[in-house]
């Protein structure tokens, strides 16, 4: 028998074995990550409940409108879902991406400035995690109007994972980097996702 054929067959079997091993490891990773997301979000809600109450009262006292701001974002599979945030802007604020604002200070409330600077406005997203719409770590979900970024993420399969409260692109630049740079970091996370990287 041709040694080359034997080698190719062995290589293909090894590849199949590697794929099965990867699938198993990926399943374990996703399962444990989901459990940790649920546990951490419940603990977070309990521990941060005094802040939730105080911020809710301050928002209601300062301006008209709901305490919680709901906005459609692109989630896993690019499917839209409502993300929750403490409302930090006036109700007449245009529905555009943060980095597209030229005069955002006009729309931000006084309490809004504080909760944005400290990222307290993101706390309600713990409920998104409980619902299964988000994870603690993952690519940040973008508004549906950011079509270019959504399509770019699709082309790299980044939309196959749950969006997160924080992600690799946020740590490496947040709104100070362009779409291509964001996708580069998100893709790097996708290809190397692990508990070590999540930490």
Predicted regions and their residues:
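Hydrophobic alpha-helix-in-membranes signature
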Residues: 49, 65, 123, 138-140, ...
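Hydrophobic structural segments characteristic of membrane proteins
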Residues: 1-19, 127-198
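Short, conserved beta-strand/loop elements in beta-sheet-dominated catalytic cores
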Residues: 113-135
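Short, well-ordered beta-strand elements within core beta-sheets of diverse protein domains
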Residues: 111-118, 187-191
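Short, glycine-rich, amphipathic interfacial segments at transmembrane boundaries or analogous
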Residues: 7, 69-107, 165-185
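Cytosolic-biased juxtamembrane loops and peripheral soluble domains of multi-pass membrane proteins
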Residues: 25, 92-110, 114, 140-147
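A hydrophobic, helix-centered structural microdomain
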Residues: 8, 20-92, 128, 195
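Residue-level signal for the nucleotide or nucleotide-sugar donor/cofactor binding architecture
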Residues: 106, 118-121, 194
């Amino acid at each position: 028998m041709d040694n080359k054929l034997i080698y190719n067959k062995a290589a293909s079997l090894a590849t199949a074995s590697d794929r099965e091993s990867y699938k198993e490891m990926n399943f374990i990773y996703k399962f444990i990550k989901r459990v940790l997301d649920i546990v951490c979000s419940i603990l977070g809600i309990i521990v941060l409940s005094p802040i939730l109450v105080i911020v809710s009262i301050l928002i209601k006292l300062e301006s008209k409108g709901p305490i919680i701001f709901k906005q459609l974002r692109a989630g896993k599979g690019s499917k839209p879902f409502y993300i929750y945030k403490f409302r930090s802007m006036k109700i007449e604020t245009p529905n555009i991406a943060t980095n597209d604002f030229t005069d955002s200070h006009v729309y931000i409330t006084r309490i809004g400035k504080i909760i944005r600077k400290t990222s307290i406005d993101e706390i309600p997203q713990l409920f998104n995690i409980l619902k299964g719409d988000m994870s603690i770590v993952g690519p940040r979900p973008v508004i549906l109007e950011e079509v270019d970024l959504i399509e770019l993420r699709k082309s790299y399969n980044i939309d196959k994972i749950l969006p997160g409260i924080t992600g690799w692109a946020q740590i490496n630049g947040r709104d100070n980097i362009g779409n291509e740079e964001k996708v580069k970091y998100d893709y790097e996370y996708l290809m190397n996702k692990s508990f070590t990287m999540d930490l």
